[in-house]
């Protein structure tokens, strides 16, 4: 992605100046390794597992396998076909008058709701669609539903979509460990639901939105095999 080119250029210049090796990887691998580190599950790099990268720009499930050269390889096996999870959350928050980015404030607001929503996510094979969440939220606001109920509905909708993706991937590829990374995975309600259902591992909040630790881990592991 173009936004990463500045960092890549700076790394190339620093490596050349220091006469140090330069290891290149992906933004996604950084998030996955950061999640494994903070969840205390670094040993999973030695076996296949499912990793979810859930943020404002990405809502994907990837099949991760060990690789002798790249440490791990990630193959996308399920994703959102339209709106991303973080977008659904932020757009809901903005519609409710919350400051952007809205995740923590929307979660706090949702905790005031006593509603128990029964939500059937929209699935297209193994992929999910989240565009309907925004439309439903707009309708709820027009119907004068309380803000806390609207907030809880949006978060429950995202959680159920991720759950349905996990079910679809497990059915297709078999039962294996599941790890969640990315900013949205820092949401406690979503994390609690998916941990209960699948025994999923989650990055700690401070490692959910920042993948710098994962990039550092990748560089360390690569240095061991050079």
Protein language model regions, located:
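Short beta-strand-loop/turn "lid" adjacent to the catalytic site in phosphate-handling enzymes
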Residues: 1-12, 16
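Short glycine-aspartate micro-motif
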Residues: 3, 49-53, 179
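General beta-strand structural signal in soluble alpha/beta enzymes
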Residues: 22-27, 180, 202-203
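Conserved phosphate-binding catalytic cores of ATP/NTP-utilizing and phosphoryl-transfer enzymes
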Residues: 25-50, 218
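Glycine-rich phosphate-binding/hydrolytic loop that grips phosphoryl groups
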Residues: 31-33, 203-226
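A short helix-loop
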Residues: 43-47, 53-55, 60-145, 225-226
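Active-site metal-binding loops of divalent metal-dependent hydrolases
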Residues: 57, 182-184, 205
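A contiguous, well-structured pocket-lining segment that forms one wall/lid of small-molecule binding clefts
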Residues: 108-177, 184-201, 220-226
